Amino acid sequence: MVNSNIEIKALGEANLLDNNDKLITPAKLREVFGSMLNHLGGNLYFTNAGGGLTVPAATETKLIGDFNTTGYKVTEYRPWYVDADYIVGANSTVQLRDFKMASFVSFRFEVGLTVPSNTEVQILARVKNSLGQKVFDINVEDLVFKSAATRTKTSNFFFFMDSDIENGTLEIYVQSDNEIQATWQSFLIDAR
């Protein structure tokens, strides 16, 4: 894993025995995944939010955070758009400018959740056009908590850039059947 700043630990080593022909081993898996991670690029942002946002029951609520607008370089391989500014002001809206048409846009984010027992939480991504009109929603997560919990949920989704959403925006929303606390902690955005 030359030049990787992400350490791969174990990766199933306890549960994966060498197969008969010795072509797939835990060490080989670590090497392959390490190589994949080395070639992932993107801009990683962390929020400076001090506490959770209260999400009222049965109310779709936009997640907000005081984001540091300087992207952190995830690996040594930086994508072509690395100097673009994807967060504007304090409105926590990801700007979809500077993306080439038909590019594959991947998005990874973390949301801290504090929920009571017997709670369903939905997380969705809303993509709007340059006029601020909704073009589509992506139902990213539908979680059911049988018992009260405080945890960080990491989610991934992707879409393809199209002229309908050129210079548009992306926002993250949370909805729950009970009042919860939600904190948008970080996001990673990349395009190929």
Model-derived regions, located:
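Extracellular jelly-roll beta-sandwich "head" domains, especially the C-terminal globular C1q domain
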Residues: 24-30, 38-192
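Extracellular "spike/adhesin" assembly and maturation modules
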Residues: 1-40
